[in-house]
Regions:
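Non-heme di-metal
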Residues: 1-246
Length: 246
């Protein structure tokens, strides 16, 4: 049964919710594709099964977001080839085609999953409790993915810390720039993300009690904490984040 967001909410507020769900659904589907692509890079059946479980979890998250959208009478846009997500996905595919498992895990389990945990945790406090519950529950599940990623990557970091940090920096400059662009200032018509139904949703976030700078700050803290856990020197990772779009 459809239970639309309270009638007192105007069309603009409803569209903000729809735009947020558009990003969430699309991001989960990109994650699903990424995890599925890892099967051919995994060294044994056990790890192949594990990444397929992760792919299934990402699909389930996307379906949960889609379900709550329908319940609330919202119509999100689903487009894994949207502008920023396409950049992230293309980078992942390039590394997968070169057989670079470490690079792929850095992108998916450190960069993307860390962003998901941070942003979904913030969106877990949205005014609409139905949507907030889905974001909060998904944040908790995504945190487990981050833990798995750290376990896999810790060995690579320990083998050659300097080489590992260099690899992260190179990937940071292609993938984290795309992610940061999603959280940066308002986009003009020529830079439309392809997921907002109208103008850029970011400037409308205060209508739901959200602050773009806070969202970005929490996302970057989560990312830096993940890198710190892998032994990446803080002076390096802080310099990388400092040069991202704001």
């Amino acid at each position: 049964m459809v239970e639309a967001i309270a009638t007192k909410a105007d069309a603009g507020v409803r569209q903000i919710y729809a735009d947020l769900l558009s990003q969430a659904i699309t991001g989960e589907l990109v994650g699903m594709r990424n995890y599925a692509a890892l099967v051919g890079l995994m060294p044994d059946v056990g790890s192949q099964i594990a990444v397929m479980h992760h792919a299934s979890a990402e699909l389930r998250h996307a379906e949960n977001f889609g379900s709550v959208a329908r319940t609330c009478g919202l119509e999100p846009i689903v487009n894994p080839d949207a502008r920023h997500w396409r950049r992230v996905r293309n980078a992942f595919v390039r590394h997968a085609e070169h057989g670079d498992l470490t690079a792929c895990l850095i992108i998916q389990e450190i960069m993307l999953e860390a962003m998901a945990v941070a942003l979904y945790s913030e969106l877990g406090a949205l005014p609409d409790e139905r949507i907030a519950r889905i974001f909060a529950a998904t944040a908790r599940e995504e945190a487990d993915h981050v833990s798995d990623g750290l376990d896999h990557l810790a060995r690579a970091a320990q083998r050659d810390p300097a080489e590992f940090a260099d690899k992260v920096e190179a990937i940071h400059d292609e993938v984290m720039v795309a992610i940061a662009d999603m959280l940066a200032g308002e986009e003009g018509p020529s830079e439309h993300c392809g997921l907002c139904a109208g103008s850029c949703v970011k400037q409308a976030l205060p209508e739901l009690g959200l602050d773009r700078s806070r969202l970005r700050g929490r996302a970057m803290r989560q990312y830096l904490e993940a890198l710190d856990a892998l032994g990446v020197p803080g002076e390096r990772s802080l310099a990388w984040v400092a040069r991202l779009p704001i």
